[in-house]
């Protein structure tokens, strides 16, 4: 039994991290403290300063634990790692750990390439970004390849190495063929320097140089060359237009601001690289209530830069708490100096004001769209409740489907809709194990049995404190089960539910002679629904989604099986050995006939793997 008063009295006066837990033992909040004793006790003292969110959290705290660290910066690092691991309910959580795309110039290579990456490492390469839009990165790289004759292959090409035959890109003028040693390292580097200038925003210099060459070509009556240079100038200017200059400096900076409407908050981030805005991103955090903006920004920075691949030299914010500590943490992560600044006036301040205005507009537009959708879905669920005469609105609906082609690789799928919206994180796939051939009823019985068997097992583990509620994959049960078939599938579902003593409403579909849904069947009664109404549109959406999900899984399995080789079934034969065997022996028949000595002559094969091949084909 957790003695709260005793634990509060015996808290240490040292830095560390504390973890708040609910009555299920689930971690609902992670925080760091300079002095654990002072910080943790504050939560349990009656205070008007507590925000509504903190008050709600404290009501749910059943117990807590703490971890002592040597310093506050260690506590901050540990806090970030634990938040990422447990995703606690009351911490500010971004929807995902975004690793934005960068353009990477591989300068450590003799003949560098220009590629896209989401990881920034100290490997001697030059990185440009981040870009919020991945397709924008792809477009820019494609335009660069059309303009500059640089290599795109992954070969390890070194100056002075043995020349190899150049590929098609050389024949069509898209590469200078360093692989064939047709260009010196220094000459190739001049081309790469132009690429770097372009990505650094100095495209006007390149355009000027290309224009001079174009005019010279025209004077020499080399009209084809002049036309080619004209096209390249257009491409370079197109790349330049993709990035808007807003500052005259060439630093890498992020501008972060927020707008709160009393309940929710929108954070907006502008990414400036070399004085140009290369992208912006927004994050909407619900239920922030009256938490002050400096706390919100501090928490946001920890979450955002804890996940992103790149930390800029300078971060501008309107206000923040723990500024010095966060600077220290960012510098450690970046492995070079990173500074947080609060501009008071001037162009930096003006940019932050612009960022805040964008945050306000984004939040207002989001809420308008959200409220419109919520009203629509609320009405659909109310209508569905009334049509089926349910006791409660079906907040969570699960739909199931079976997919097979002539009994091949039968699979089942489960899709989930909560409050009228699809919830892909709760979708589940089932490979049918116990049914041979195409038997939809038996297959459906198997997947429903597995779904609720797993669910009951997880609920018991949660009750026994062996599993956290948030870690359960099947522990949340639906308010309504929607079957794509009629009475037969409904009876299968009810049979499974009765086996487990579970009471959940189950309805099926009524189809017309063209196999189009015209209504629902529930408790043995057919209910015809207006085909133009919102309920029918919703049911159709659920049907389409469960079909799509089942078919996509089935296709993926068929794709895997179509590439299956007999060699995949031999112990100790992996992908490398399989490729080597096929390369050397050309066919499975030749491998079957191979002797022990012939198998061992292949470098990747050893005695054990050779014996396995001989044993398999014996």
Swiss-Prot record:
Protein name, UniProt field: UvrABC system protein C
UniProt-listed SUPFAM superfamilies: C-terminal UvrC-binding domain of UvrB, GIY-YIG endonuclease, RuvA domain 2-like
Domain UVR: 204-239
GO molecular function: DNA binding; excinuclease ABC activity
UniProt keyword terms in alphabetical order: Cytoplasm, DNA damage, DNA excision, DNA repair, Excision nuclease, SOS response
Subunit structure: Interacts with UvrB in an incision complex.
Highest taxon, organism lineage: Bacteria
One Gene Ontology term, aspect cellular component: cytoplasm
UniProt record similarity statement: Belongs to the UvrC family.
Localization: Cytoplasm
NCBIfam families (UniProt xref): PRK00558.1-5 (NF001824), uvrC (TIGR00194)
Pfam families: GIY-YIG, HHH_2, UVR, UvrC_RNaseH, UvrC_RNaseH_dom
